Amino acid sequence: MSKPKRERSLPDNEAKAVARMLRVSPQKLNLVAQMIRGRKASAALADLQFSRKRIAVDVKKCLESAIANAENNHELEVDDLVVSQAFVGKGIVMKRFSPRGRGRSGRVFKPFSQLTIIVRQVEASA
């Protein structure tokens, strides 16, 4: 016997996608997340397409996943989607050593991040 389905935490007009283990610091990822917050999904995709930030490719992939979730899983209209939330969380931090002069060593931190994108369908203004 299977477990009962969990209640959906989002409203019916929203869909989300999560990208984990992104190899970038949360501070740098938040710069790209700020660009797309509150924008139409199509405009946000265009911004990410021409962004010069390295992580914009992964953010675009996560946004496309959120749009696909909205379309296929929740039957939302793609043309009416807006990025309602895009927030960044800290992931793990890998610690490595770098050789320094005179037999010493220095620590190198390699941070990871998590990205959550929530898209919402807004009513088309007539």
UniProtKB/Swiss-Prot annotation:
Give the record's keywords alphabetically. Ribonucleoprotein, Ribosomal protein, RNA-binding, rRNA-binding
GO terms in the biological process aspect are:
translation
Q: Entry's HAMAP family?
A: Ribosomal_uL22_B
Task: Relate the assembly described in the record.
Answer: Part of the 50S ribosomal subunit.
As for family, the record states: Belongs to the universal ribosomal protein uL22 family.
NCBIfam families per the record?
Answer: rplV_bact (TIGR01044)
Protein name according to UniProt: Large ribosomal subunit protein uL22
**The species this protein was found in:** Bradyrhizobium sp. (strain ORS 278)
